[in-house]
């Protein structure tokens, strides 16, 4: 049996028990009523039922639901985006109140059609959530916003509790996996964020199963640490449709455990690694862990 045939079917550890209790259905109705989007739905996250039904958490996706890029791993719609909705920040903030969230993740589609990459609306969303939810920690997950330093500064000046920007894959595969984004530009984005606000933890995520080697992954970890990234998440890539890149390998849980140990040995303050781990998975626990370790270091 060839390796390709061996990984044709999803293994047992990727089978998910669906839970659509009243929390799940209630959150879904609320999102629709407020004309809000979540990356949980748009990117077909495998953890949506756990997060919505059990943990009652969600990751808001602002700046519309249409992305200007067409990364070959991503299920989010691509094309010409809609006009900016300047009332969106307040609706997100109101939803955080209604959901009673202790930690919220705010992400966005890439808006290469905008000079600021959507930074102004992103920053205002952070401020709106902070005004109405002063005890809620806020994590932001932006695109590289064109690599423009002023755009990043606008966002960092809003003082999120954590800055997350994903390199998504290893250096060797980056151009094939996300042609409109650049590996080095993402590293620079993360480095600049830390330079602008040294006390704000930074975070990044890598998908596995796209053809990377163990050496590729170790190189990516070293690159992130060299740019002072604090938190790393590692998860299994799952093909959203036949139009997207195929899965070349399904990593077993034991291999994720090995990768986590390697990451922690590199100096990451926290590493979340597992088949169903996504960038926002258990994000509240990640930011708490990072802050505790930062306090200990002082």
Curated annotation (Swiss-Prot):
Q: Where does this protein reside within or beyond the cell?
A: Cytoplasm
**Cofactor field:** [4Fe-4S] cluster
Which SMART domains has this protein been placed in? Elp3 (SM00729)
Question: What pathway or pathways are given for this protein in its record?
Answer: Protein modification; protein lipoylation via endogenous pathway; protein N(6)-(lipoyl)lysine from octanoyl-[acyl-carrier-protein]
Q: Where does the chain bind [4Fe-4S] cluster 2?
A: 67, 71, 74
Q: Which Gene3D superfamilies would you find in this protein's record?
A: Aldolase class I
Q: Which UniProt keywords apply?
A: 4Fe-4S, Cytoplasm, Iron, Iron-sulfur, Metal-binding, S-adenosyl-L-methionine, Transferase
Report the main location listed first in the record: cytoplasm
A cellular component term (GO) from this record?
A: cytoplasm
Instruction: Give me the comment on cofactor binding.
Output: Binds 2 [4Fe-4S] clusters per subunit. One cluster is coordinated with 3 cysteines and an exchangeable S-adenosyl-L-methionine.
Positions bound to [4Fe-4S] cluster 1: 40, 45, 51, 280
Main EC class the enzyme belongs to: transferase
> Pfam families in the record, alphabetically?
LIAS_N, Radical_SAM
Ranges where the Radical SAM core domain occurs: 53-269
Listed under catalytic activity are:
[[Fe-S] cluster scaffold protein carrying a second [4Fe-4S](2+) cluster] + N(6)-octanoyl-L-lysyl-[protein] + 2 oxidized [2Fe-2S]-[ferredoxin] + 2 S-adenosyl-L-methionine + 4 H(+) = [[Fe-S] cluster scaffold protein] + N(6)-[(R)-dihydrolipoyl]-L-lysyl-[protein] + 4 Fe(3+) + 2 hydrogen sulfide + 2 5'-deoxyadenosine + 2 L-methionine + 2 reduced [2Fe-2S]-[ferredoxin]
> Molecular function terms in GO for this entry?
4 iron, 4 sulfur cluster binding; lipoate synthase activity; metal ion binding
Q: Any idea of its EC number?
A: 2.8.1.8
On the tree of life, the source organism's domain of life is Bacteria
Q: Which family does it belong to?
A: Belongs to the radical SAM superfamily. Lipoyl synthase family.
Q: Which NCBIfam families does the record cross-reference, listed alphabetically? A: lipA, PRK05481.1, PRK12928.1
UniProt protein name: Lipoyl synthase
Species whose genome carries this gene = Bacillus cereus (strain B4264)
Q: Which gene encodes it?
A: lipA
């Amino acid at each position: 049996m060839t390796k390709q045939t061996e990984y044709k079917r999803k293994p047992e550890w990727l089978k998910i028990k669906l839970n659509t209790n009243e929390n799940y259905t209630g959150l879904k109705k609320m999102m629709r009523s407020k004309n809000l989007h979540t990356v949980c739905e748009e990117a077909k996250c495998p953890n949506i039922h756990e997060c919505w039904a059990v943990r009652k958490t969600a990751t808001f996706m602002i700046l519309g639901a249409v992305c200007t890029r067409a990364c070959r791993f991503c299920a989010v719609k691509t094309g010409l985006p809609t006009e900016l909705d300047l009332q969106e920040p307040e609706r997100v903030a109101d939803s955080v109140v209604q959901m009673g969230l202790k930690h919220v993740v705010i992400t966005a589609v890439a808006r290469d059609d905008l000079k600021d990459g959507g930074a102004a609306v992103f920053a205002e969303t952070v401020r709106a959530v902070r005004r109405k939810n002063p005890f809620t920690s806020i994590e932001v997950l932006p695109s590289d916003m064109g690599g423009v330093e002023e755009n990043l500064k606008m966002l960092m000046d809003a003082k999120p509790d954590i800055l997350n920007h994903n390199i998504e894959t290893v250096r060797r595969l980056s151009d094939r996996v996300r042609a409109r984004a650049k590996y080095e530009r993402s590293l620079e984005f993360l480095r600049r964020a830390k330079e602008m606000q040294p006390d704000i933890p930074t975070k990044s995520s890598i998908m596995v199963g796209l053809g990377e080697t163990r050496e590729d992954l170790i190189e990516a970890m070293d690159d992130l640490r060299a740019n002072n990234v604090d938190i790393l998440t590692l998860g299994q890539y799952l093909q959203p449709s036949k139009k997207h890149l195929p899965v070349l390998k399904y990593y077993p849980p034991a291999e994720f455990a090995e990768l986590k140990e390697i990451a922690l040995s590199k100096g990451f303050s926290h590493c979340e690694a597992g088949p169903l781990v996504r960038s926002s998975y258990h994000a509240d626990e990640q930011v708490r862990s990072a802050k505790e370790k930062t306090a200990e270091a002082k």
